[in-house]
């Protein structure tokens, strides 16, 4: 299982604040629903936990998604981010 926090894909955050992908492929303020759409289009099984808080922002309930994948985490995050760019256009 790979944990995907919306912060990993957020263009507005720095690497120190939690972004894991490059700014070129990151998206502005990704929502859980958008990430779910991207995962459906990628045909990846997942489960959503909406009441979870990102450790760096424990006061915000941003939620997280657990994805079943054998791919390395960064490769998966890049795929999700690119799919999010398609969805948001």
Swiss-Prot record:
> How does this chain assemble?
Part of the signal recognition particle protein translocation system, which is composed of SRP and FtsY. Archaeal SRP consists of a 7S RNA molecule of 300 nucleotides and two protein subunits: SRP54 and SRP19.
Native organism is Methanobrevibacter smithii (strain ATCC 35061 / DSM 861 / OCM 144 / PS)
Please tell me where this protein is predominantly located. Answer: cytoplasm
Which InterPro entries does this entry report, sorted A to Z? Signal_recog_particle_SRP19, SRP19-like_sf, SRP19_arc-type
Give UniProt keywords alphabetically.
Answer: Cytoplasm, Ribonucleoprotein, RNA-binding, Signal recognition particle
Q: Name one GO molecular function term.
A: 7S RNA binding
Any Gene Ontology biological process: SRP-dependent cotranslational protein targeting to membrane, signal sequence recognition
User: Record's Gene Ontology CC terms?
Assistant: signal recognition particle
This molecule's function is given as:
Involved in targeting and insertion of nascent membrane proteins into the cytoplasmic membrane. Binds directly to 7S RNA and mediates binding of the 54 kDa subunit of the SRP.
Q: Name one Pfam family in it.
A: SRP19
| Name this polypeptide is given | Signal recognition particle 19 kDa protein
Gene field: srp19
Q: Which Gene3D superfamilies does the UniProt record give?
A: Signal recognition particle, SRP19-like subunit (3.30.56.30)
Protein origin, superkingdom: Archaea
